[in-house]
Amino acid sequence: TIDYNTGRPKDGAMMTTDGVIDFHSAMEANAASENGSEVIFTNAINDHKWYGLLSSYKNRFTENFTLTGGFDGRYYRGYHAEKIDDLLGGAYYAPGSKALDFQTSDAILKEGDYVQYYSVGEIVWAGLFAQAEYTKEKWSAFLSASLTEEAYRYHDRGGAPIDGKKISDFYHFLPWSVKGGFNYKFTKNHNVFVNAGYFTRAPFFNAVFPNNNIVANDNAPYEKIMTFELGYGFSTHNFNLALNGYYTRWNDKTTRRQIGDEYANITGLDAVH
């Protein structure tokens, strides 16, 4: 009964004269119905499990040169489902044509049963990163880079099989980043610095699987971020001042919006910060 875009009741919802949802009338209608509850409360369940391994290496090769690197491995598995929480006075709920794949079209559902959707998402992540830093008395500079292999897979436990499958293939992405910076200390108390970077980021999981099933959007673009920062610092024994400005351009962002019972997958958005 709620439009998730506006936070307001959908058209046709039972309302009081004060403009709020009339749950009392809904419960009376549910109790009198011979076809089960028409209005119910449900709980959306999002159960996330993350496992990770992080290993790093650091070596100061000379008085001025330091190298840092490492490996970042992660595995994510997320369960996403909706369960009936309250039948609001009715004896049962009949999903009809919206029954999940493991339910029949004439299923009689009670509190605690699954409705609407039941899916599992997997993300496998393995990345390498490195940073080199060179420091002198008056100045310092660094250069860092990273490369990551990411793979997404969708399990549609509640939906009907597509081409005989309920589990998608893995879809692979290879985002990377590079960033550099320079700092110059022109007196004991004053310094200026500049940083710049370019990053690519794999599209979000729901941009790759926008239809809540195993059919993937093969054209989901990488998000691309370019950023610059310029700053000035002043420090004494008991006072610190930092002034900085930045410019960030973010291209090919993706977002998804629900319109009624349908979803819109919007790609190619650009932003400047």
Task: Show the residue positions of the predicted features.
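Outer-membrane beta-barrel domain signature, strongest for Gram-negative TonB-dependent receptors
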Residues: 1-77, 82, 238-244
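Signature of Gram-negative outer-membrane beta-barrel scaffolds
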Residues: 40, 66-187, 204, 209
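Tryptophan-centric aromatic hotspots in well-structured domains and transmembrane helices
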Residues: 50-51, 81, 117, 125, ...
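Hydrophobic, lipid-facing positions within transmembrane beta-strands of outer-membrane proteins
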Residues: 49-55, 124-130, 147, 176-180, ...
